[in-house]
């Protein structure tokens, strides 16, 4: 009788072990999903944005400009290491996630060679002709790691829907004067463009950057298309990867924030 109870107990133990093994993943997906991150606590957000509360339109835009203009500025060479932190793959700390392709790639594989990643200015640096100078040219809130070839294809094009598929970067499309990023980062792109329009208002010796509703802006300090960007912002709200990025920039590098990640409703309040 005791031997029978032991056999039953052993069978239960083996079954439990099998269930436990089945519940533990043996590998990680090659395309990492966003992981939870600590957003700015409500009390801290209230303090940071206190002077902007209750405002709309140009008054809100001006108040946010005053707030986010208080920042630490990086050199262009410092951006390499910073992007390794801001865009770190949450499942592999040795890698970054490339903006347009979504590929996870070694932090050390950056430069100008085919297959490397480089520093993409989401607000194209020729739109306002600020180049890579400290300021808009080195602002982490719109700099992202991207594949060298895909970055070249995007060039300084405005953002819009449509075009032909970009080889090697599924979900991205381009034509002669515009670029459409993959769905998972459309809102990210929109919020980066709108951050730049609030942060750089013709002060500090740089152009007044503004969104408009056209493509082919060239070297003018405008970026399109605002109607499409607002649609992308609505359809792709901030996820945990984007919120974590905002935290890293604020806490470890620039000490300023992208308000449209923290308060998405402010896009409609201004535009």
Whereabouts are the PLM-identified features?
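Secretory targeting and sorting signals
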Residues: 1-32
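Feature targets compositionally biased, intrinsically disordered low-complexity regions
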Residues: 5-10, 53-56, 101, 110-111
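Intrinsically disordered, low-complexity, compositionally biased regions/tails
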Residues: 10, 14-15, 88, 172-175
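A generic structural signal for short, solvent-exposed coil/turn residues
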Residues: 22, 90-91, 111, 252
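N-terminal module-boundary/linker segments of secreted carbohydrate-active enzymes
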Residues: 28-102, 266-271
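A broad, low-specificity signal for short, low-complexity segments enriched in glycine/proline
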Residues: 57-61, 104-111, 229
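Short, His- and charge-rich active-site/binding loops that engage polyanionic ligands
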Residues: 96-98, 102-116
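Domain-level detector of nuclease and nuclease-like folds
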Residues: 112-271
């Amino acid at each position: 009788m005791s031997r029978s109870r032991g056999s039953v107990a052993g069978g239960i133990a083996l079954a439990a072990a099998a269930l436990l093994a089945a519940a533990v993943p043996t590998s990680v997906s090659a395309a990492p999903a966003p992981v939870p991150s600590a957003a700015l606590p409500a009390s801290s957000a209230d303090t940071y944005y206190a002077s902007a509360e209750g405002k709309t339109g140009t008054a809100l835009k001006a108040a946010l400009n005053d707030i986010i203009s208080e920042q630490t500025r990086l050199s262009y060479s410092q951006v390499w290491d910073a992007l390794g932190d801001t865009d770190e793959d949450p499942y592999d700390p040795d890698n970054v996630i490339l903006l347009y392709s979504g590929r996870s790639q070694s932090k050390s594989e950056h430069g100008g060679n085919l297959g490397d990643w480089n520093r993409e200015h989401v607000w194209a640096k020729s739109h306002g002709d600020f180049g890579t100078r400290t300021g808009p040219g080195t602002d982490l809130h719109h700099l992202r790691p991207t594949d060298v070839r895909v970055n070249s294809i995007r060039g300084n094009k405005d953002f819009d829907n449509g075009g032909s598929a970009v080889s090697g970067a599924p979900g991205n499309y381009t034509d002669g004067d515009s670029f459409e990023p993959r769905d998972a980062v459309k809102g990210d792109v929109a919020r980066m463009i709108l951050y730049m329009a609030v942060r750089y208002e013709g002060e500090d010796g740089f152009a007044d950057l503004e969104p408009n509703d056209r493509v082919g802006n060239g070297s003018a300090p405008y970026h399109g298309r605002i109607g499409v960007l607002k649609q992308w912002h609505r359809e792709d709200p901030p996820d945990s990867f984007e919120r974590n990025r905002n935290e890293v920039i604020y806490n470890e590098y620039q000490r300023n924030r992208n308000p449209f990640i923290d308060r998405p409703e402010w896009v409609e309040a201004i535009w």
